[in-house]
Amino acid sequence: MERICEPELMDEPLQARAYAEADFSGSDQAFTARILELMACVPGANPSDALRILDLGCGPGNISFRLAAALPQARLLGLDGAKAMLALAEQNRQREIEQWPHLHFQLARLPLPPHDLAALEALPAGFRPPYAVIISNSLLHHLHDPAVLWQTVHQLAAPAALVVVRDLRRPPHPQALQELVERHASAAPAVLRRDFANSLAAAFSPQEVEAQLVAAGLSGFRVESVDDRYLEVSGQRPLWQS
């Protein structure tokens, strides 16, 4: 089936609240564990080090909070362009502010305009670019121009930075899409069922992502299918692009 773009930002309050209240704990924990596994294998991204980590498209902070809890010595910045989503993330951080001195959320939309880039560079030292680890969960399919994500990686990643991206992958036909919605969202609120279906239709195939990476000069990154609906992109930014 052909790709059908969806809105880039999830900025409806009802939509943001439904997403934040949904139970993604299983997939969120699996992605967090995968990030930590890859970090342990990459020189310069060791989980025991005081790293700068960037979560692109952090939404309400599901992955940001899990990773920050696992890496209290790191500095983690969550970036999102949706005010409604970021407000939920910041509310959760403020509830236990003493627990999260190493976690910060920032409003910014990709591609980063000069004023947003300047705002990042004005953050406290531990949160400024460049970043040793860049992660992203379910952002790519929202972007009408997927090259924006890979351009941002070049813009903000340190030399040899670890990049880990998880996203939905587009089903081959509408029937397969509906089967996934029924399998994974049959009991979800209508707004989540709608958004899940739209997101699956807006997602990319592994082959399309591989072509994006070649065009971006990131052909060394690995693209893998994960379970019945995700794909994973992982790799290190080439040193020669520093």
What is the meaning of each model-derived region?
Residues M1-A18:
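N-terminal, positively charged/glycine-rich alpha-helical extensions of SAM-dependent methyltransferases
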Residues A160-D167:
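Conserved beta-strand signature within the Rossmann-like core of class I S-adenosyl-L-methionine
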